[in-house]
Design a protein with these regions (language model features):
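Interaction interfaces in information-processing and related assembly proteins
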Residues: 3-212
Length: 212
């Protein structure tokens, strides 16, 4: 009996921007296996390996920033740096919607230890001065960083969810959103939004991991 041929891994991650009608929320969704595969190939090329917990944090950051880029206006380049104390670490990620790439790196040496954990954001648009913001974060979880970032810098609620199979989802509130529905969401409900709500795809982008 002939063995089934496995499907090839895509070279890019397809990111969908979906409007959830009647809830007035934007859902950004993607399966990040292609980006994570290229990320690991890059680590092999530079002969670098991270402890599993730090590796997971950096991958989460790459995914979360990609979703955020897709939720933002198209012509932006965004960089996030998380400066974490105890142990002293810097998680860095940057990406561009124009060129549809994401990249990132973990720094463990010569890192300044802050008195608190901070997330630094810089947004660049061609022909304009960069916009920067700094927020304090309480944990080393990028999904929590995004929540605080949206509350403080975006001035609208945003929540990120990590689903099975390298799938991540960002739910970003729009004007007149259904607050009760938004605040009651859990992972199981987020996974069923496309089946139980009225989604309308607005845009699709294709992101790749850039080696830098």
């Amino acid at each position: 009996m002939q063995e089934p041929v496995p499907e090839p891994v895509q070279e890019f991650t397809k990111v969908e921007s979906i409007f959830v009608r009647h809830r007035n929320c934007l859902m950004i969704r993607a399966e990040f296996t292609p980006i994570f595969t290229d990320y690991y190939l890059h680590l092999m090329d530079i002969e670098e390996r991270h402890p599993e917990n730090l590796d997971t944090t950096l991958k989460d950051l790459l995914a979360i920033l990609t979703l955020h880029l897709t939720a933002r206006p198209w012509a932006e380049t965004i960089a996030w740096t998380a400066n974490i104390r105890g142990p002293r670490l810097n998680f860095f990620a940057t990406g561009s919607s124009v060129h549809e790439y994401i990249t990132g790196r973990l720094f463990t040496e010569d890192v300044r230890e802050p008195d608190r954990n901070f997330l630094y954001s810089q947004t660049t648009t061609q022909g304009k001065e960069p916009r920067t913001s700094t927020i304090e974060v309480e944990t080393s979880d990028p999904l929590e960083w995004l929540r605080h970032f949206y509350d403080q810098s975006e001035q609208r609620p945003g929540r990120a969810y990590k689903l099975p199979n390298d799938t991540y989802v960002l739910i970003a509130a729009q004007p007149d959103f259904d607050q009760e529905w938004f605040e009651g969401l859990n992972i199981e409900q987020v996974a069923k939004i496309s089946d139980e709500e009225e989604p309308k795809t607005r845009a699709t982008r294709r992101f790749k991991f850039a080696c830098g």
